C-alpha cells in the first residue's frame, strides 16, 4: 500500500540532513519518514537481514529500495533518465530510487558511479533533498536523475 504523502512530506521536512549521523543519510531519512507514515517496520527490516544504523534505521538506498519492492510497495515504475526536462517526470508526489547516480570516494573514475540515492519526489519540483539542501545537489533538483548510468530510476506514487 502506498504511503500517504500528507504523513511523509511534513515529517521528512522536519528532519536534519544527517538525522542519525550516518553516512547513508538518504536511506535513514526516508526510513524515518516511512516509519512515521506507518510504512516501515524497523524490526521487520532488521529481521530481513538488512544493514541498519545505530538507531535501527535503514542504511543503504539499494537495500531500502529492494525491501520496499519486496515487502511494502511492490514493483516501481521505471522513469526516463534524462534529468533536464521536468515535464518527463510524474505529475504526482512519491518515492524515487536512483541507482549508480553519483561518484563515491572509493570509485576509480567519474565514469564508475556506484552511489545510489532514495528520496521523496515532489511533482513538478524534483528531489526533495535537492530542494532542501541545494548545495549537496549541484545542477538543481532534477540534475542527479540524469546521471544514473544504467537507467535505473524507479518511482512509487504516494497516496
Positions of PLM-derived features:
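N-terminal capping segments
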Residues: 1-55
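Hydrophobic transmembrane signal anchors and adjacent membrane-proximal interface regions, especially
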Residues: 15, 76-78, 142-146
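Extracellular cell-wall/glycan-interacting regions and their flexible linkers
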Residues: 26, 59-62, 156-159
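...with weaker cross-activation on analogous glycine-rich loops/strands in unrelated enzymes
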Residues: 48-131
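Glycine-rich, aromatic-bearing surface loops/beta-hairpins
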Residues: 115-159
